[in-house]
């Protein structure tokens, strides 16, 4: 696939930066950060424009907090000016992140999403005898910076854009607990960044193509790091799963225990329990829904 260049000029166009401001401010128009930025919007956008063009830009000013729904996650909220930057980049780069994604990956994509993924999965549940569910351990925290930078360089050739991507990527490192907390060098993208959603989706794109084109899996669906594989030959499916596990380990990822069942038994996926001819809320989703009532 031909790499794309000359995008920095489009990213730094004042109309694009203004659009990025409105996207970043959506739902937060009364916050102090938005108000401060808006009061000098022309000056602030010009400053951001010059910082992008010069490469002299500060990123990684995160506010950390935890959420517990449906499980504990560390969220990293970037500063408002940084969120404007993220939107400015993705307003322009979004279609180029889309180009090499397979049809059956459903996260962070216009016209896709959870319910389209469930609908597609239901077809597999009806058509095939076996289903395997794969889930990557601590996916966002395990993304290798060097590998991600290399993958982005296969999509984009603009050196200033790649420098900007790398600066955003290396502004964060995941923290792991091992007796005492310590930083793991060179891994992780922050949950909460708009850019992280695109980076994380792209990180597994080559794996998608490996599964579909080299292994020839009959039907395969991915929603970020949650994957379903379908087939009628259990032995073949087991062999394919071993090869996928090996492929993921090459890019620093490890799977949680794989679930391989007959489709008639059902499988949990994206908060639902899927059967050949019905889809139900799973137990955890039911409890979460009741708490919100």
Report the location of each language-model feature:
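Conserved polymerase palm-domain catalytic core
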Residues: 44, 51-52, 104, 109, ...
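PAPS/PAP-binding and catalytic site of the sulfotransferase fold
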Residues: 88-92, 227, 244, 248
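Gly/Ser/Thr-rich beta-alpha loop segments that engage phosphate groups in nucleotides
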Residues: 34, 190, 194, 273
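Short acidic (Asp/Glu) and glycine-rich catalytic loops that position anionic groups and cofactors
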Residues: 1, 22-29, 66-68, 181-182, ...
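Conserved two-metal-ion catalytic palm core of "right-hand" nucleic acid polymerases
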Residues: 1-157, 172
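Short acidic-glycine loop/turn motifs at beta-strand connectors
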Residues: 69-71, 232, 277
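Short, conserved aromatic-histidine micro-motifs
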Residues: 56-61, 217-221, 289-293
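C-terminal polymerase-core module
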Residues: 234-293
